[in-house]
Amino acid sequence: MKKHISFPSIEQFKNIIANVNRKHNFIGLDENGDAIYDPTKPKPKLKFKGTVKLHGTNFGVSYNAIDGLWAQSRENIITPEKDNSGSAFFVETHKTAFLILMGQIADTHKIDVKTNTITIYGEWAGKGIQKSVAIANIDKAMFIFGVKITPHPKHEEDKTPAYWVDSSFLRSPEDRIFNIEDYPQYEIEIDFNYPQLSQNKIIEMTIAVEDECPVGKAFGFEGIGEGIVFSHMTEDGEVYRFKSKGEKHSKASKVSTLKPVDDAKINNIIETVNKVTPDWRLEQMLDKTFDIMNGGKIEIKRMGEFIRNVVNDVLKEESDTIATAGLEPKDINAKVSERCRNYFFVKQNEEVGLK
């Protein structure tokens, strides 16, 4: 039976920061089956590949040996009779090309199409689909940007997660099936310990695409672009994706855009916080809060009290250091609190023998 296999919503940068932190902080489940997180674990540095985000409509083509080939929009299975901007009709009239692509995926990634569904995702873009962008001037075409493999479980309890595979080799330009990776790409390494330090570079690349769409230019049309989709694929086929869009293409609706940050100030804050919160100060305030020297125990419900003690001691003893750095207490309080929380959890874990 044909099923709609949805393409996930592309997140904002802030959501990806939260997702990466949650995954890398996860250490297991407790006796009640609830997740346990360790916020002190170092965050990863991940390389993200950026491709041009086209302003069209989401388009998927699925295949397995049992149900054959079918087309889908973001929300529904579609047919030439109930279409989405002509994309289902395009599949119907280019079946041979899509079946060849499905065969290439199955061969390259060793996919059994009797027990798995392959879905090719792309943007259906061109004349009559969207307006005010360079790509709106070309004849309609599909631009592939991803391939997902969905296993078929024999029983519901045997269900295994879908996963993503490389799609960079897929294209059939003579059939107007292109690959977004054949156009200019962008790369950035994001340190998730300090993700905001990547923000300005992301904005810079996005503005370049917004000012002149590289894909539209490749087809001979000048005009604005929508933005960039950044993605990182893990070894187990999970993909982190986030979008960065400009405002020029959307005159009516409000677009969520990244705001520039002061890299020098952020680095200054990090350096100053490290200077004013040495381990000995945190240890002193931990003892003051919990009376550890006399047998007191660390309690999570009093973590806020510990943080306040550290903040107050820093303001009392390090005001000159903060002022010399050209900062105010409000500039560093959030980072001081973060440093305190990390230290607190390290000491709590040591107390119960986890480290």
Where do the language-model regions lie?
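Core nucleotide-handling region used for phosphoryl-transfer chemistry
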Residues: M1-K355
